[in-house]
Amino acid sequence: MSKRKITNLFNVDFKPFDNYGKPVPGMSWHKISYDRANGGYGTYLLKMDPNTKSLHHVHSGYEEFLMVDGELIDLDGKIFKKGDFVTFEPDSTHSSYTKE
């Protein structure tokens, strides 16, 4: 099939996370199907180093992610752990951070 794409999650190149315009220190990503031009929809892999914080942001659509490893703490103190599938609905706002 010529319209098939296979991504091996253990063999990808991560680039600085620049979805907010400029790179966020400690964050990197690998775009799989993400396209900012279509409203920022699609899939990507995101890595956050220890002691890293995302910028506070508003979601125009759904944001969904699977915690593959580690822990992520949201602005309200909720801790997302390995195996958690998290959904933020449209118009939700938040930021998240990692500890050591």
Could you say what each language-model-derived stretch is?
Residues Y44-L46, S54-H59, D76-K78, S96-T98:
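Short histidine-centered beta-strand/loop micro-motifs
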Residues H59-L75, K82:
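Glycine- and acidic-residue-biased ligand/ion/polar-headgroup-sensing regions
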Residues M1-G40:
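A short, N-terminal "cap"/entry segment at the start of jelly-roll beta-barrel domains
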Residues A37, P90-E100:
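Ligand-binding loop in jelly-roll beta-barrel domains
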Residues M27, T43, Y62:
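Short coil/loop residues immediately preceding or within conserved phosphate-binding loops
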